[in-house]
A protein has these predicted regions:
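Conserved Rossmann-fold NAD(P)-dependent oxidoreductase catalytic core, especially the SDR/UDP-sugar
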Residues: 2, 7, 18-62, 81
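Short, hydrophobic alpha-helical segments
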Residues: 138-142, 167, 244-251
Length: 260
């Protein structure tokens, strides 16, 4: 059964409302439980309704819809769990890490004596720990359950110190936290480019500043309940950033992340 579940979880990550229904109609005939790899932005939307995230961000709205559709299929003979996953560190052989975009962003400030970045923080875990909670959810979760997942919580300042160390620039880089309005000003060019190209971003550009200013932390007790064990998050961040830097520098060529 686990092989079917793993196949299902890999596909479900890249689909939203309508396709989700078709997948569940098919999968429910084959297995007794399903694990959906969701997003911790859904957790934030439920924890902070005052931020009105589903109104502002199509991506977050689609994740909430995905949970709703998934749970509609749960019954006495079919368990559905959604893992609300945060940022994941570690490498996947042959794949380009999503953190290349971070290198592109902070590289522009390398010549400055400091880096300006939002003042919030994020939950995170390693690739291995994701595998552990997937197996745990498949074996232990009952009914319709959303699991907010995290094993570590770092402020952006703490995280960037590790990033700069991984880039060979030491851990004493000065990080200046900026207010959301300043980040919105900095993203003005991106917003203009999207408007000119007719692009609707899954995460609203203006609203992103408010999300980045939040300490989006999650207790580790949920991940541990599903069987996650301790790992070296600093080493995992190092691995992700080193590969991302190599991709940025053009010294390696890897496949981009995509839905399959």
């Amino acid at each position: 059964m686990l092989s079917s579940l793993h196949l299902f979880t890999m596909h479900i990550t890249s689909i939203t409302f309508s396709p989700s229904r078709e997948y569940f109609l098919f999968v429910k005939r084959l297995v007794k439980s399903a694990v959906v790899l969701g997003s911790y932005f859904a957790y934030l939307a439920k924890e902070r309704p005052d931020m009105e995230l589903t109104k502002k961000h199509p991506y977050i709205r689609s994740r909430i819809d995905q949970e709703r559709v998934a749970f509609s299929f749960a019954d006495d003979s079919f368990d559905v769990s959604v893992l609300e996953l945060p940022y994941i560190f570690g490498t996947q052989p042959g794949r380009k890490p999503v953190w290349v975009i971070l290198i592109e962003q902070i590289k522009r400030m390398d010549k400055l004596p400091f880096t300006m970045y939002p003042g919030g923080g994020t939950a995170m875990l390693t690739v291995r720990q994701v595998g552990e909670v997937i197996v745990g959810a498949a074996e232990k979760s009952k009914g319709a359950t959303a699991w907010p997942i995290s094993m570590y919580n770092l402020t952006w300042k703490e995280f960037l110190k590790i990033v700069y160390a991984a880039r060979g620039m030491g851990e004493d880089r000065k990080i200046i936290s900026v207010a959301p309005w300043m980040m919105r000003m900095g993203l003005g060019g991106v917003k203009k480019e999207y408007a000119e190209k007719g692009i609707e971003s899954g995460i609203d550009v203006d609203g992103l500043a408010d999300i980045m200013d939040v300490n989006l932390f999650i207790p580790d007790r949920f991940a541990k309940e599903l069987g996650a064990t301790d790992d070296d998050i600093k080493s995992a961040i190092f691995d992700s950033i080193k590969v991302s830097q190599a991709v940025y520098d053009g010294t390696v060529e890897l496949l981009g992340m995509k839905g399959e």
